Design a protein with these regions (language model features):
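Acyl-donor binding region in acyl/amide transferases
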Residues: 105-271
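Short acidic (Asp/Glu) patches
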Residues: 63-71, 77-81, 101, 111-128
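Short, flexible loop/turn elements at secondary-structure junctions
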Residues: 39-42, 88-90, 99-104, 142-144, ...
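Conserved N-terminal entry element of GNAT/NAT acetyltransferase domains
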Residues: 2-41
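Short amphipathic alpha-helix that is part of the acyltransferase structural core
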Residues: 27-72, 83-102
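Aromatic sugar-binding interfaces of carbohydrate-active proteins
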Residues: 259-266, 271-292
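C-terminal non-catalytic accessory extensions
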Residues: 287-332
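A short helix-loop-beta-strand connector motif used in the catalytic cores of GNAT acetyltransferases and
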Residues: 74-85, 108, 271-272, 282-288, ...
């Protein structure tokens, strides 16, 4: 779909020079990898490599920006997003990453009254969300796993890539205990079978609703289903039973439920889903908004990704400079 060539890989030596100890967040629980956090201004070459890997991964599935490198104003602004990456020190490669922003740092655009978030063009936020939720929410975006680590040829490294990323997200909640929620999106691509997509979206809307109407898509993607089929497919209100039926139905179409959809559902049974918008500027991908309460993450995930983190070993100056102030405020 896109013809602009993606930039060449950035030298691993340049990235190593930028991934200094002050950016190290933690070691991963599995795979022998490391997690770093930084702003683009402090690691510009690493930011270029992130942009290359993001564009490569998103284009592979039919999304992407169409530019030679997926880096935008939200990455580069002085008050913009921070990057969280998993680094494989043995291979000298980035496995994957997120960009994130703490909600109490989000600026409100005076002209529009909207928060300066990457999702603000796709979703409308209720006054209650802006007042009661956003200040205690970590907004997540641009989740990716590098293409080489999506294949089994990388062995255990591939298996643990997403798990490693959640080690990083878990550490953020320990370092900034004022944060109570994760807000972000799951993506399905334009070429994903519409029938399978609608079954998945119906299931999410049924079992992970937003009764308070906190967030809604600016231009919602309609969920078109056959009522007779739905009654037969989901005859009860039992979430696990209906999930098994959904998984079977999607497999019969020849597909799998997207991994991130499965992964987020497994994090918390109380997840909220906010509907789906089409991102016209990103290859017409379908973006579904979600909210997960940190204290509702299931116990085994909390133990694995949150309780294993020792904040006394965190070295990231960028985090400590900003978070220690908040911790003092919470305690006072």
């Amino acid at each position: 779909m896109f013809t602009t060539p993606i930039i060449a890989p950035v030298s691993a030596d340049l990235i190593r020079q930028e991934l200094t100890p002050d950016k190290l967040l933690r070691a991963t629980n599995k795979g022998g990898n490391e997690i770093y956090v930084f702003h683009a201004s402090t690691a510009p070459e690493t930011m270029r490599e992130i942009g290359r890997l993001r564009e490569e991964a998103f284009r592979f599935y039919g999304g992407g920006t169409g530019r030679d490198c997926d880096v935008d104003e939200f990455d580069l602004a002085d008050d913009g997003y921070r990057q969280l990456i998993v680094w494989d020190p043995a291979e000298g490669a980035i496995l994957g990453g997120y960009r994130f922003m703490f909600g109490d740092e989000v600026q409100i655009d005076e002209a529009t009254g909207r928060p300066r978030l990457a999702t603000a063009e796709l979703f409308e936020f209720s006054p209650r969300f802006l007042t009661d939720y956003l200040p205690v929410t970590i907004e997540l975006g641009r989740s990716f796993v590098s293409l080489p680590y999506q294949s089994t040829r990388m062995g255990a490294k591939s298996l643990f890539a997403l798990d490693n990323l959640w080690d990083g997200l878990g550490a953020l909640t320990v370092l900034n205990p004022a944060m109570k929620y994760f807000y972000g999106k799951v993506t399905m691509y334009e070429d994903y079978d519409p029938h399978a997509r609608n079954l998945i979206l119906y299931f999410l809307d049924k079992h992970f609703p937003d009764p308070d109407h906190l967030v809604r898509p600016t231009d919602p993607l309609p969920i078109v289903v056959d009522e007779v089929e739905i009654r037969e497919l989901f005859p009860t209100d039992d979430r696990l039973e209906n999930y098994r039926a959904l998984n079977k139905a999607v497999r019969e179409i020849g597909l799998n439920i997207p991994p991130l959809v499965n992964a987020y559902m497994a994090l918390s049974p109380e997840m909220r889903v906010f509907g789906t918008a089409i991102n016209e500027d990103f290859g017409h991908v379908e973006e579904t908004g979600i909210l997960i309460a940190i204290d509702e993450i299931i116990p085994d995930k909390r133990v694995r990704h949150i309780e294993t983190f020792d904040p006394d070993k965190a070295q990231s100056d960028l985090l400590w400079t900003n978070i220690s102030r908040r911790v003092r405020l919470v305690k006072s």
